[in-house]
């Protein structure tokens, strides 16, 4: 029986996705985003920095879906978009969120952003009562109450995005 020997300096998990694919639209790049495996094979003493671990852990909750007995909720970080640049609608059994803004100047140059998200709604969500709120810190909250029936308020419709001046700390559970 052969046993594969793995060197300690090469134990870096190869499955970690790069921040290029995360939801940090235009937040800048780090060296390990462009060359993720070069630094782990060069030095046997290389370790992740504490700052990198913090960034990876802060990824959770960027888009969060909650469904309990009474309501269905979606939390989405859209801090780079204003309510006028967001379009939220219910189409068939999905809630769709689109955001788009033109070219703007930031610290790194010029950037334009666009995204499209779709979330399947449970069959007992009252689609006619779905609301959408954007908090002051850029957290979009979509809330739909659940009803006893299975076909309440079905159909395509646009949902207005209302602005809330309070910050939203609910998703970090």
UniProtKB/Swiss-Prot annotation:
Zn(2+) 2 binds at residue 108. The keyword rRNA-binding does not apply. The modification N-acetylmethionine is found at residue 1. Zn(2+) 1 binds at residues 101, 103. Disulfide bonds join 132-143. The keyword Transport does not apply. Residues 53-164 form the sHSP domain. It is found in: Cytoplasm; Nucleus. Residues 143-173 are annotated as: Disordered. Keywords: Acetylation, Cytoplasm, Disulfide bond, Eye lens protein, Metal-binding, Nucleus, Zinc. Residues 153-167 have a biased composition (Basic and acidic residues). GO terms for molecular function: metal ion binding; structural constituent of eye lens; unfolded protein binding. GO terms for cellular component: cytoplasm; nucleus. Belongs to the small heat shock protein (HSP20) family. Heteropolymer composed of three CRYAA and one CRYAB subunits. Inter-subunit bridging via zinc ions enhances stability, which is crucial as there is no protein turn over in the lens. Zinc coordination is achieved at least by His-101, Glu-103 and His-108. His-101 and Glu-103 come from the same molecule within the oligomer, while His-108 residue is provided by another molecule. Can also form homodimers and homotetramers (dimers of dimers) which serve as the building blocks of homooligomers. Part of a complex required for lens intermediate filament formation composed of BFSP1, BFSP2 and CRYAA. This is Alpha-crystallin A chain. It comes from Psalidodon fasciatus.
